[in-house]
Amino acid sequence: LGSTLAEIWSREAWGKWSYVDDDLLKPHNVVRHIGKDCHIGKSKVDVVKELVDLNYHSGEKSIAIHAKINDSENPQVKEAIDNAELLVDVTTSIETARDLPTLANLTRIVSTFITPSGEDAVLLFEDKYQKIRVDALETQYYRAILNNDWGVKHLKKHLGAFKTGGGCRDISMVISDELIKL
């Protein structure tokens, strides 16, 4: 989802972006990532930077930082967070979602993700004055799932407690590429 958003926003010439991720592009990522087979083994952020910077010769060039976004000791990460007007969290890491409000205390955060079926998307966006931080919005989101009729279908195709790892390393689902781009 993150690379797709980067591609869309780049084509729209929206924003000057710093991409932060410590992951490498793996063969199973190519199905949904903008990276291609020839990029396997490379840093995901380097691949995203390379591809989105090709969209406009004279456009804003992005910055790629191969690190964890919650690595508060990394000077590049700290600078990227401190200089950001908006921090878009598209990670699948619960740890990251919990750390960002304290690391980005002056930077507005938006968190976005898709549900297991790929049929629903979620956008948690802090208000202009950050009266309600993204971690509190996430709690409200979970409460809404439990307390509304739509919550029953919202997480359909979730595999329950059977997991093989964490975040995007969980068991893969077959999701149409069109759903990712919608």
Positions of predicted regions on the chain:
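Glycine-rich phosphate-binding loop and adjoining beta1-alpha1-beta2 segment
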Residues: 22-60
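Extended hydrophobic-aromatic, low-complexity segments
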Residues: 19, 27-30, 41, 97-100, ...
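Flexible loop/turn segments at secondary-structure boundaries
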Residues: 2-3, 25-28, 69-73, 95-97, ...
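Short His-Asn-centered micro-motif
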Residues: 1, 20-21, 67, 88-92, ...
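Glycine-rich adenosine-cofactor-binding loop
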Residues: 1-24
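C-terminal structured domains
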Residues: 4, 68, 72-85
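S-adenosyl-L-methionine
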Residues: 53-76
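Glycine-rich phosphate/adenylate-binding loop
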Residues: 82-86, 90-182
